[in-house]
């Protein structure tokens, strides 16, 4: 599962 930091990076 993608981390919240990964989602924020987009």
Swiss-Prot record:
Domain of life of the organism encoding this protein: Eukaryota
Taxonomic path: Eukaryota, Viridiplantae, Streptophyta, Embryophyta, Tracheophyta
Protein family according to the UniProt entry: Belongs to the thaumatin family.
Name the record gives this protein: Thaumatin-like protein 5
Location in the cell: Secreted; Secreted, Cell wall
Entry keywords, A to Z: Cell wall, Disulfide bond, Secreted
GO cellular component: extracellular region
Protein species of origin: Taxus baccata (English yew)
